[in-house]
Amino acid sequence: MSAQEIIRSIEAEQLKSNLPEIYIGDTVRVGVKIKEGDKYRVQPYEGVVIARRNGGINETITVRRVFQGVGVERVFLLHSPRIDNIKVLRRGKVRRAKLYYLRGRVGKATRIKQRFDRSL
């Protein structure tokens, strides 16, 4: 076995199997585990998926939302143990792989049409 095959086999054990199908433009709610003292709690983060990168264990999504008039983006490693759950709330209809143009828009211009042909 080559080194790459060994690495892939080890990474395959770490991949999460309960992830939903996530597409660009979807509105998702990501449950992030946060440690406070010796306790853990799950903090939800809701927004629009504007980018997906990499694959396998390094796969990430960038989620954008507007909080108190300021755009906030977070990058989540999909297979990280800090991600408790991901729920797709809405499917978006877009024609781009990266929605970075939303950064320059404000108000109603940031809305994305809903897509009904894919199930949640």
Curated annotation (Swiss-Prot):
Q: Which Pfam families match?
A: Ribosomal_L19
List, alphabetically, the InterPro entries matched.
Answer: Ribosomal_bL19, Ribosomal_bL19_CS, Ribosomal_bL19_sf, Translation_prot_SH3-like_sf
Task: Tell me which GO cellular component terms the UniProt record holds.
Answer: cytosolic large ribosomal subunit
Asked if the Swiss-Prot or TrEMBL record annotates the protein with the keyword Ribosomal protein, the reply is yes
Q: PROSITE patterns, from UniProt?
A: RIBOSOMAL_L19 (PS01015)
MF terms per GO, please?
Answer: structural constituent of ribosome
What family classification does the UniProt entry report for this protein?
Belongs to the bacterial ribosomal protein bL19 family.
Can you name this protein?
Large ribosomal subunit protein bL19
Tell me the keywords, alphabetical order: Ribonucleoprotein, Ribosomal protein
A GO biological-process term: translation
Species whose genome carries this gene = Trichormus variabilis (strain ATCC 29413 / PCC 7937) (Anabaena variabilis)
Functional description taken from the UniProt entry: This protein is located at the 30S-50S ribosomal subunit interface and may play a role in the structure and function of the aminoacyl-tRNA binding site.
